Amino acid sequence: MSATPRLALPLIAAGQAQKHVTHNEALVRLDALLHLVVASRTQAVPPAAPDEASAYIVPADGTGAFAGHAEALALFEDGGWLFLTPRPGWQAWVVDEAQHHVWTGTQWRRAQPESSLGAAL
């Protein structure tokens, strides 16, 4: 196994050189995925000057750097985009919708309230 099963964090191999690189990559992913907040899931064009640690859910019509990464998480780290394939159960707060979404394995769905009070919570 070269990555963890839930968050796909890279594991350090026995005898691996430059262990700090793998360790730092895992920390970057962990920092992004824990309490995941994305700016949007409908913005097809990557921002021209994204802030470090910006995150987006790439829509199907993504262009530029987002092209070919539909439904992936796009994380801007170290001056470039890192694309992660979501796993079932991952949750994200989508800022421009003010809603939680959950990856079902095939799509991002708005999380449903579990209370009989519905959206009142």
Language model features with spans:
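Flexible, charged surface loops at secondary-structure boundaries
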Residues: P46-E52, P86
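Residue-level detector of intrinsically disordered, flexible termini
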Residues: A48, L73, Q91, G118-A119
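Short, surface-exposed terminal/edge motifs of secreted or surface/virion proteins that either
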Residues: D31-H35, A55-P113
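Glycine-rich, low-complexity segments
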Residues: M1-L11, G15-P47, A98-L121
